[in-house]
From Swiss-Prot:
UniProt keyword list: Ribonucleoprotein, Ribosomal protein, RNA-binding, rRNA-binding
InterPro entries: Ribosomal_bL20, RIBOSOMAL_L20_CS, Ribosomal_protein_bL20_C
GO function terms (MF aspect): rRNA binding; structural constituent of ribosome
Domain of life: Bacteria
Pfam families in UniProt: Ribosomal_L20 (PF00453)
Name listed for the protein in its UniProt record: Large ribosomal subunit protein bL20
PANTHER family cross-referenced by the UniProt entry: 39S RIBOSOMAL PROTEIN L20
Family: Belongs to the bacterial ribosomal protein bL20 family.
GO BP terms: ribosomal large subunit assembly; translation
Natural source organism: Chlamydia trachomatis serovar L2 (strain ATCC VR-902B / DSM 19102 / 434/Bu)
Annotated Gene3D superfamilies: 6.10.160.10, Ribosomal protein L20 (1.10.1900.20)
Role noted for this protein: Binds directly to 23S ribosomal RNA and is necessary for the in vitro assembly process of the 50S ribosomal subunit. It is not involved in the protein synthesizing functions of that subunit.
Keyword check for rRNA processing: no
Amino acid sequence: MVRATGSVASRSRRKRVLKQAKGFWGDRKGHFRQSRSSVMRAMAFNYMHRKDRKGDFRSLWITRLNVASRIHGLSYSRLINGLKQAGIHLNRKMLSEMAIHDPQGFAVVATQAKLALEAAVQG
């Protein structure tokens, strides 16, 4: 009976890891054992940061909205509260894009929010 070796599978596994380690520095690029641990670590960081990216973008949008709303005499929290009271359903990403690319449109939205806040205080 022929002796079955795992050479084809082993070689393809090593090639896959070394291919993923392309761009790494020193032994981490060309030596399988070093590459394997570095690739696993890189993949773990990649997974974490894919999750973090969502919150990072939300923070960016909020920062942009805070700056844009202060130009119109509102803080970020008062802008969001006013939008909710006015029944304007725009998410933070869309508002942020609007503040950058369509300042006149954002001014209209901010004015609506301000009017809704004033109406809530009076009524």
